[in-house]
Every structure is written in structure tokens, then in C-alpha cells.
Amino acid sequence: MPSLIPPIVSASSASNSAALDHLYHHQPPPRLPLGAVPQSPIQSQAPPPPHLHPPSHHFQLHPGHGHHQQPHHERDHRLPPPVASYSAHSHHLQHDPLPQRLESSQPGHPGAAEHRDHPQHALDEPSRSHDPYPSMATGALVHSESQQPASASLLLPISNVEEATGRRYHLDVVQQPRRARMCGFGDKDRRPITPPPCVRLIIIDVATGKEIDCNDIDHSMFVLNVDLWNEDGTREVNLVRSSTSSSPSVSSTVTYPYGSISVGESSHTYGQSAHPPSREAPYSVSQTASYAPEYQTQPTYSQGSSAYPSNGTYGPPQQYFPQHQAYRTETGPPGAMQTTVGGFRGYAQDQNALTKMAVVGGQPQGMFTRNLIGSLAASAFRLADTSEHLGIWFVLQDLSVRTEGPFRLRFSFVNVGPLAGQNGAKVNTGRAPILASCFSEVFNVYSAKKFPGVCESTPLSKTFAAQGIKIPIRKDANLKGGDGEDDYGD
């Protein structure tokens, strides 16, 4: 058998081959075939010896360079481990954090320094990249859950103690409002909320903790006030910009709380002009008014509260923007962009504020009016419920809402009778504190086309009507065609 003659390798080629072999240990291996199993993560995380760290510029070489010169024994070392080895360590890949994997590496394992598999790192990174997203989603869920108790706490009833008498007052909305038809801005066809809200007043003796008999209580000075709030119970919506049409659309009406409109000279107050200002003296008005740039013949001012064209024509109701506390001069000199009118000092608004206040001629401007109309205060009555149990009740049978949407009613109870220190007085001439308050459930106000019909008269309403309370009782549904009819009887 002929002896094998070793190949003759020059010094330059030997040095190049050694350099390529040295670099190859630090190049990414070829991609694994489809059926191959990735390498063990514990072996892939083993730190290399210090003498094998290459310079940073070596990683910028082409990975395919010198691939065909790889020795056979190195290829054997880079074969994937058995399936059992991978399955044994797959549990650590899913649950163990990165520092634990580094500590659990086996430095004595043969070829541990050579098993640095960069594709395995690429497989490991997506699994770690998904870790922040569950934490972020969990944080958002915790934040939303923390917001729910905050909003729910606003809807909790308030029960206070009257120190002079030692009584605690509590309101219980026994009959909740369900739906109503929007009445618009005309008073001829006003439909009340059905069924009428019925609130029972419960008085507890603080000393004994028991309910006081209503026959022992003088309820002649008890008053229940009601106002309108949004469905979340975070903002009152008692004001709305009125219109001359009897059935305004939702887009032309905006509700506002009482606190957003006030009278004064501060920069946070808003005024309304009952009549359009004259052309000759557009700056003499003490209250704020604005002119449309399409009709202007001289420098004008604009605010989100109203929009009056200077030629005497008017537009439909526009939205009121309390956050815009500024005036704008379109045709005046640049020095006139900052001015003072009627005690207000402001700066020019952006163009978006004027686009929101587009003026269309044909209808006069409206004024702010109440959104909840009717009898907003009710006196107390001693009535018997359906189980013949006497109690102090407040019945609000005359409430209507001008605009459609979901709302809540807030009930506030006060005692306007004389205080303990007012001897001989019949009426409280000072302030009356709110002794109890609560919210109703959410009810919906529909437009005339979407209104499903008034609710049937409840047994409680019929019981109170039989005792002299003026509650509109629905006529027999069989005579008038069902729930869709709006006929009432007394």
C-alpha cells in the first residue's frame, strides 16, 4: 500500500489557512436544515475563553469566506445535539432568566467554547423580545382596573349627619328612569322621563342605628333638587346652546356644566350678546361677540362663544369652546393681533378655531339654556308604597331633556327648615347643607324617530297616583295599540 505523501504547503498559504481557521471559529455557521434541531441553549450561552475573543472588525467579514476550508472534525462538533438533549434543556429556555442560564453553563463540557451558535441567539432573542409586551399589557390592565374604582367611587351615594338632630339621611332611588323622548327647544310637545323617578328618604338615628318612623318627622321643609349629569357621573350637563328650531340635531347642540359659564371681568368668564353688535361701533360691546371673516368689512374679533356676521345675517347654533379664550383680527395690522376688548385680553387663535365656527346664514343665533327642564325641585310626601309601607317620598314626574344621549340624574336632599339656633324662625334664611345625594342609573334620551315609546305605568306609579300624586298614568295599551303610543291619562 503506497504511503500517503503530505501536501506541500507554502509558508504564506499556511499562515493564510491558519488565519482563516482562526476566523472561522468566530463566524456564524451555515443555517440549519429544516429538519434539524437547534442546539442546546445552555451550551450556546457558555462564555468563550479570553484568548478566543477576536477583534471587532473580524465580524464584518463575509460569513461565506473560508467556509469550504472547514475541517471535518469541526463540522462534527457543530452538528446539532440529540433531541433528548434539547428537550432536557428546553424548559430552562422558557422559564430561566438570562443570568441563571449563564451561571448554569458547563465550562468543562468538551467543545463548550466552540459551540457558540449565533442563530441560536437569534432564536433566543424573539422569545425575550415578547417579555416586555405582556408586562406592558398587564400594566395597562392594572391602570384600567384602577380607573374603574375611581369612576365608580364618584357614583357612590353621599350620606351626612345633621349635627343638630343627630340624624343621618340616605336617599334610595326605588323607581329608576329608563328612557325619554328629546323635547328640543319647544315647550308645546314636551315628553317627560318615563317612568317618573321616585326617591325614598331614609332617616337613621345615629344613637340607636335604627330608622326613624316617618310619622315622627316633620317633612314640610324637605326639598329634593335634581340636575343632569353625563353617563359616567363625572360632569354635569345642565346647559345647552338653544336653537330656534323645535327639533335640533345633536351636532348643533352641545351641553355644558353650570360652572363653565359665569359673569365677571376675569379671563375665565364668558359672556353672550342678546343682540348683534352694530356696524358703526363694533368695539363698544362689553360682552364678547365674534364676526365671521367671510362677511367682514373691518377688523373683527372672534371667540368660540358665538359667531355673528357683520352684515346682519345669522348662522345656525355653533359649538361653544371654553378653552379658546382669545380674539382674532384678520384684516388688521400685525400690531393689532393683541388687543383688549370689554376687559378681556387675549391673543389670536389658530385657523382651526375659525373653521369650527363656520357661519351659514338663515337662522338666528341661540342662547344658552337649561338642558334639563321641568320641575327640578320636589317637595316631600308621606306615601304608602305597593306593600302599604309608609315612607317619605319624592316624586319627579315632570322632567324632560332637550337633547338626546345617555344621561344620569343626580338627586340632592336639603332641609330648608330653621336651624337649631334660629329660635322662632320658620324658614332657614342662611345656607342649607346637602344632607344626602345619589345618582340614578343611566337612561337614554331618543330623538323622535328613534324613540321606542313611553314605558308602561308601573305599579308604584299607579299606587302614588291613587294617593293624589299627579303622575301621568298610561292608558290601557290594548286600547291604543301597544307600547309605541304616547297617550297618557290622569
UniProtKB/Swiss-Prot annotation:
GO CC, alphabetical: cytoplasm; nucleus
Biased composition (Polar residues): 295-313
Signal peptide: none
Cell compartments where the protein resides: Nucleus; Cytoplasm
Record field: transmembrane: none
Phenotype reported upon loss of the gene: Leads to a significantly hampered growth when cellulose is used as the sole carbon source. Decreases strongly sporulation and down-regulates of cellulase-coding genes.
Residue span(s) of domain Velvet: 164-474
Keyword presence, Metal-binding: no
Keywords: Cytoplasm, Nucleus, Sporulation, Transcription, Transcription regulation
Key word Lipid metabolism present: no
Superkingdom classification of source: Eukaryota
Bias (Basic and acidic residues): 112-131
Function comment: Component of the velvet transcription factor complex that controls sexual/asexual developmental ratio in response to light, promoting sexual development in the darkness while stimulating asexual sporulation under illumination. The velvet complex acts as a global regulator for secondary metabolite gene expression. Component of the VEL2-VOS1 heterodimeric complex that plays a dual role in activating genes associated with spore maturation and repressing certain development-associated genes.
Protein name in the entry: Velvet complex subunit 2
Organism: Hypocrea jecorina (strain QM6a)
Lineage: Eukaryota, Fungi, Dikarya, Ascomycota, Pezizomycotina
Primary gene name: VEL2
